[in-house]
Amino acid sequence: AMNVTEIGSGEGPLVEEVRRLVGPKVPIAVALDFHANNTEQLVKNANIICGYRTAPHTDEEETQERAARLLLRCILENVLPECVMVCPPLLFPGEMITTEVDPCKSLIAELKKAEEKQGVWTASLFGGMPWCDAPNAGASVVVCGPKGCKEPTDEAKRIADLFWKEREKFGFEEKAMSPEDAILWAQEREASPIFISDSGDNVTGGAPGDSAYLLSLLMKHECKNVLVAGIVDRPAVEAFYLSAEGEEKKVKIGKSIDSKSTETEVTGKLKQKGFIERGGSKDIRFALIAVGGIDIILTDERCSFTTQKNIEETGAK
């Protein structure tokens, strides 16, 4: 779902340039995110397109391997497949289209049925990326197979039709509330842990991750035993990096990237500082601070916290 200023879709021009360099007789295989916003420019220049089949994503390596194996098949069989794309007029936020529950779960199963058909090498369904303000934002079904076979087109149309027919059944798997209502709801519950996801500032969805809006509400309601993971604020991290653990400092948090975001002033006590490992290198600095009963992980770069390990490496518990 890459979108580049003055270019538009990033993947299409990138693959088109690869095609220009390698020529028309070299196979090209592409592995894509489930939320890809696909274009005809991409489809006509790739021979193999494989998409993740999980959202949340747990099959990245499996998808890359599938694309690599099909690329090898192209070479061994001396075949140049082509891709067919059908785009139903649908655009869902990611929270409404998860693959662990129906109707999306059943649609993913249809991909495997399609691949049992002669003439179909691989089939992929894409939910699209709604937060990308682009003409190509939206759902798509891409099926690949040898040139001249009608099955890829037939299966792409069939699955896209099913996608459209099931459109009214998509909904939020978890409770959807306003931020303040979510906090009040959580305060009334004895069970723990309770996760509140700020879908409006979701780093994995392309957002800056610098909003302190939820933090300001948590402070307003004097919440205790809460972890905010995390907020991007390089100046705040740098300020605490000059402090010793246990030292208090008054800083403004938030609005460090997006001028339209929310900031709030806090007096925080430094609990721990260090580096967060991402992509095999420890290159993101963090500061774990305490503000009353709220712990906050501050980072100097955009950083998602999607696993328990991500959180524990900051010293937060």
Model-derived features: positions:
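Core alpha/beta catalytic barrel or barrel-like domain that forms the active/cofactor pocket
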Residues: A1, A31, H35, E82-M85, ...
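Active-site histidine-anchored catalytic micro-motif
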Residues: A1-I75, D198-L215, M219, C223-V232
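Short alpha-helical segments and helix-capping/turn motifs at coil-helix boundaries
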Residues: P13, A212-Y213, D283-I284, T307-N310
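Short, compositionally biased low-complexity segments
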Residues: K44-N47, N78-C87, W131-P135, D154, ...
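Short, basic, helix/turn surface patches
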Residues: A55-T63, L80-E82, K252-S261
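Conserved anion/nucleotide-ligand pocket segment
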Residues: Q64-A68, L72-K112
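Hard-cation-handling environments
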Residues: E95-E301
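A C-terminal functional module that forms or caps the active site or interfaces directly
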Residues: D295-K317
